């Protein structure tokens, strides 16, 4: 039902709720839809609708995620909420539900807890650009000084993970009071105030089409009399006939010119993000290009072999490994369209990684791959997915 109602004439932004178990993430999600429904910006959902999150698969991993959508005066939002902590870890690492920003929910009665810390760290590692805070359950705290103490703790915690803790907006309220229609100051008004901070503080993401051109190579053909065609789906940006492009990854970077773009056997002047195209390359031989490389705007992306990853390792039940792995483990890393072998080094003081763990790993690939921070990958053994990861930092 809700699908027809939204006019896509506002800028779109993807957000989510993060924070410790039982601090009120799902209740807040419900409260936002209920309050915004009053002005026609959402379809009201109750807690049970959101909590019964459907399963979905991302990079071979099953994740439970609930999606709701709503709009404010300024923007249209897709909002993701996960039922369990493991779902958050998997979601953020696989990028199944992209987050342009997140609402960190902290209970005023408890203050920051272990998963509060872990979700902030994950947000930092996977590159969530901005966070705002909703301090929930203030109806359970009578002492104003205690609220100030919790706020100070949250700000210090955010700063310790390189978020601007002093500047991040913190809204105090109670999602439950908002749903029950109680005291509007901590109920409805707090939800509207929170949405204003989300509108104002979370930056509008670049649309894929506005970013520098990038297309992972899926296949290569040679067409007699015309040259070499590489096919794939354009991930970002635009490529125009006559423009210079680079072929990056696996071997030395090559420069060439795009002499044609084809889609559905029709010739185009340009291809753009989302299009499945064939790109004709001038003077490039069939054997100069292979699957796993990328075609890109010159200088926009570089090949690397060493990086720091944040990874989630599947449990046995999820089809992953049955046993832990140790330092010098050599699986395949599946980037975009191809597998590359890499060596994992565990961090100082970490003896092994168990199935179901998420951890920071140092990785060295045997061949360079075009990468930047935030690139997602799967960890595989003989074609079977055993984990998922994201490039947190490039080393060389």
From Swiss-Prot:
Region annotated G4 sits at: 136-139
Under which name does UniProt file this protein?
Elongation factor Tu 1
Q: Which domain of life is it from?
A: Bacteria
Under PROSITE patterns, the record lists: G_TR_1, G_TR_2
Residues of the region (G3) are 81-84
UniProt source species: Caulobacter sp. (strain K31)
Assembly and binders: Monomer.
Could you name the Gene Ontology cellular component terms for this entry? cytosol
Query: What compartments host this protein?
Result: Cytoplasm
> What does the record give under GO molecular function?
GTP binding; GTPase activity; guanosine tetraphosphate binding; translation elongation factor activity
NCBIfam families, sorted? EF-Tu, PRK00049.1, PRK12735.1, PRK12736.1, small_GTP
| Record domain tr-type G: where | 10-206
